[in-house]
Amino acid sequence: MRDYEGNGVDIDNNGASPYSQHISRDHENERDSSRSRDKERDKGRDKDRDRDRNRDRDRDRDRVKERDKDRHRDRDGEKDRDRHHRDRHRDRSDRRERERTRDRDEDDLHRSRDYDRRRDNDKDREDRRRHRPSSRGRSEHRSKSRSRSPSKSKRISGFDMAPPTTALLPGATDAAGQVPGTNPAIPGLFSNMFPLASSQFGALPMMPVQAMTQQATRHARRVYVGGLPPTANEQSVATFFSHVMYAIGGNTAGPGDAVVNVYINHEKKFAFVEMRSVEEASNAMALDGVIFEGGPVKVRRPSDYNPSLAATLGPSQPSPNLNLAAVGSTPGSSGGLEGPDRIFVGGLPYYFTESQIRELLESFGQLRGFDLVKDRETGNSKGYAFCVYQDVSVTDIACAALNGIKMGDKTLTVRRANQGTTQPNPEQESVLLHAQQQIALQRFMLQPGALATKVLCLTEVVTVDELNDDDDYQDILEDMRTECEKFGALVNVVIPRPNPNGVPTPGLGKVFLEYADVDGSSKARQGLNGRKFGGNQVVAVFYPENKFSEGDYEA
């Protein structure tokens, strides 16, 4: 119902005008709009908060991930550091291992070379023993450079390692081949051979003198054993003869083995057996024909045996008290070529056969023993022989009748083999004089402060048998050069050789080494003196330079 109409204003029943109602509606709309805006604003803020929360969550998550990554990186870094340390340690270990391996390789190389050399040495040494008759058993094979067939590798040094220092002291009296704890091989030898007053030289060092004893008596201490079976070797021969000598009571130098060394030639089936003493070697002569490995063997004196000189060294006949029955032998079963009635027959034509020579000799009576000396290599006669008659009373008759007889282009020389033993013959006098000079020389050289020279003299190195063969001689020269130039500049090596006509050679058996300076010779003397060469103990002394330059090798 409208209350007012005159002024155009409508008023409702409640008394409100339309205008006010319109305003009121606007206000309500505005409030609604404001509320809507507030709601929208709140929604926006909520969205922002949610977005912020989500962002914070994402940030936290990223931060956590980043921390985890950092942690992993740190862990990886530690692993890397550990790996780096391990790598460095491994590198160091590898480097050390490589160095050790290189050192081991070098050592192995040296050892391998040494082993190869030793193996070749042993092989060559065995070949030499098998194929050559000389005392050290050198091989017949020679190097191609010498145009000899079959070929042979280079000779191996005969030197062994240096002996203990006690072997070089004056009190060390055990000589090469002498069993420790036993008496010397030849008691009283030097009082008979070298009548030198003790005041003349004073107390001599024993080692060089005993070494000289071994050299001086070697020819009388060796026996030749022929007819060996193919299976024989050095060890079996040494064991057999040591056992047999003990069984017959032939050991006179004390307890232990009588055999010192054995040099065997497998091709020619013979050996040289070296005994401890002259007396034991003489006892071994009673073993001629003894059964060895199923067959008899011949036991003889070697070709270098000197009966005249041996007579001054010890018994030359076997002991009559030997128990030969212990080995199945009987006294007198040997060839009977020993004793004062032994005859030397020289100047025989080389083409004479053994039967022809026997026929000539037996024209004076039956022979108890006969031995035609033959070349070990070729088997040909050397032009001389030895014999003993059953009736010794015909000995001088045969000598007088046969001596001086012309046989073809030769003239016979027939005499007692031991003729002149009461007085030293020229050869014996030479040996004794040489021994006296050697003692005097060594006494001077071994005195404290003795004058050193550039020349060194070695004894106890080579034997006469080894110097006769040209190729053996060249081998020894090479051997000496190879070994001795290790100590200094080696200028010259001189090794005197035997004269083919039998005239004594000054310095025979010695080796002279000339160095560029005294330092080299002094080192060589220190390194070589007392060492073993082929089983012999080497004696090294300085030698006067003026004598060496003049070719005087006798002092």
UniProtKB/Swiss-Prot annotation:
DNA-binding found in the keyword field: no
Q: Which PROSITE patterns match?
A: RRM (PS50102)
Q: Where is the composition biased (Basic and acidic residues)?
A: 23-81, 90-127
Pfam families, per this entry? RRM_1
Known role: Necessary for the splicing of pre-mRNA. Binds to the U -enriched regions of plant introns.
Q: Which family does it belong to?
A: Belongs to the splicing factor SR family.
NCBIfam families assigned to the protein according to its UniProt record, in alphabetical order: U2AF_lg (TIGR01642)
Q: What protein does this entry describe?
A: Splicing factor U2af large subunit A
Which species expresses this protein natively? Nicotiana plumbaginifolia
Gene name as annotated: U2AF65A
